[in-house]
Structure formats: structure tokens, C-alpha cells
């Protein structure tokens, strides 16, 4: 039985190219996995990659992850794709949006069977989501839209109901605004989680520190 179950949600949307943020994100993933393998081998750890969709990733896949290429440069994007339509595949969809809602949904599925009260999501991102699912429909909305924010907050509430805490590590980026920061606080605090501001270069240190703190609280 794991004492602690964690899903790490890694933002690999187009903006993570900025200042090589994606490199720091991958380094953090490897550092956290190494710590758990050495010190807490019974703990559960799963990685989920987020772009316009969310995909589970094995630790062996993390080093090869890359930010998705930006394929649309329009100042306003409002797209809807019916992913239940067999004529529509993932390859038809611009990949560089940020679907945190789908990432949290996958995280809940991984954490549901874990027999521990200590469940959490570590979300590493640089700002507001720009994609979400409503049933089979995928919405890609830029600039960030209230509809996507509300869908993501609903997913956060489901996490909270299932005893899952969301901690957010918010990376600085050129486009970050007060709205990005406020959203991170709303999402984290709705699950009794926290927001950490860290430069990318320090990310691995802070995430490992947070994990060790959490383990000490459990033991205490």
C-alpha cells in the first residue's frame, strides 16, 4: 500500500519553449522519480503530459518530451472538434494548446484506485488553460476563455471531492499576466493546495523539497 500517491502533470504546450522551460520540467520529473525510487519505493508516481490533449507517460518517455509546435498564429482562436467522430483524429487538431482539465481528469483516474488518503497532483505550468473537453467535444479557445477556466475548475472540484490536493508550480513566462496567477491560486486553493513560484532552473529542487515536506507531515 503506498503511503503517498502522486500524479505529476507536465505542461508541454507551445509556450513551454520559452527560455527552455520544458528542459527544466523534464529535469524535475527525473529528479522526483529518482528520489521516490531510492527513498520511498512503495509510493505511487505517474506522469501525465498536457498539450491540446493529455497523455499518460512512463518515466522512460519523459526525457524525449518536447513542447508542441505552434501551428496557428491567429490572435483569436475558437475551435470545437468532435473527438467521437471517426473522421477526426488527434492529428487534425492544433497541438499547442494547454488542456489542464483533461490532465486533471486523467490524474483522478490514476489516483482513484490508490489505497491511501495522501493523494495529490503536482501541476507544472506557466499559466491559464486554453483547451478543455465537454463530453466528446474538445474546445480550443485563445485568448484564454472563461468557459475553459470553469471546466478546469469543475475538474479541480472533483479532485477535491475525491481527497486529492493540487499543488501548482507556476513557471515565469514572457506572456504571464495577473490572470494566470489568480487562476493558479483559485485552482490550488479550491483543493487546499498551494502555489509555488519558481524560476525553471530551481524547479527540481523545489518539487523535491515539497515532496520531502509532505512525507514528513505524513510520518508526523
Annotate each language-model stretch with its function.
Residues 29, 100, 152:
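Aromatic/hydrophobic pocket-lining residues that form the small-molecule binding cavity
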Residues 1-76, 103-107, 117-124, 167-171:
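Von Willebrand factor
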Residues 21, 25, 96, 141-148:
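Residue-level preference for long, well-ordered alpha-helices that form the structural scaffold
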Residues 43-87, 132-136, 176-187, 207-208:
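Short beta-strand-loop
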Amino acid at each position: 500500500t503506498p503511503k503517498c500517491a502522486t500524479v505529476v502533470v507536465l505542461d508541454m504546450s507551445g509556450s513551454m519553449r520559452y527560455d527552455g522551460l520544458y528542459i527544466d520540467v523534464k529535469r524535475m520529473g527525473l529528479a522526483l522519480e529518482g528520489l521516490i525510487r531510492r527513498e520511498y519505493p512503495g509510493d505511487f508516481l505517474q506522469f501525465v503530459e498536457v498539450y491540446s490533449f493529455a497523455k499518460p507517460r512512463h518515466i522512460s518517455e519523459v526525457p524525449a518530451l518536447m513542447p508542441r509546435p505552434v501551428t496557428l498564429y491567429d490572435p483569436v482562436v475558437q475551435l470545437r472538434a468532435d473527438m467521437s467522430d471517426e473522421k477526426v483524429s488527434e492529428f487534425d487538431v492544433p497541438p499547442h494548446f494547454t488542456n489542464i482539465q483533461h490532465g486533471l481528469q486523467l490524474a483522478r483516474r490514476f489516483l482513484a484506485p490508490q489505497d491511501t488518503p495522501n493523494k495529490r497532483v503536482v501541476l507544472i505550468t506557466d499559466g491559464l488553460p486554453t483547451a478543455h473537453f465537454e463530453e466528446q467535444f474538445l474546445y480550443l479557445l485563445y485568448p484564454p476563455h472563461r468557459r475553459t477556466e470553469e471546466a478546469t475548475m469543475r475538474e479541480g472540484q472533483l479532485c477535491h471531492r475525491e481527497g486529492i490536493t493540487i499543488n501548482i508550480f507556476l513557471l515565469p513566462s514572457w506572456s504571464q499576466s495577473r490572470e494566470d496567477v489568480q487562476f493558479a491560486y483559485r485552482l490550488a486553493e479550491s483543493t487546499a493546495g498551494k502555489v509555488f513560484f519558481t524560476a525553471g532552473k530551481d524547479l527540481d529542487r523545489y518539487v523535491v523539497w515539497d515532496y520531502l515536506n509532505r512525507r514528513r507531515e505524513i510520518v508526523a
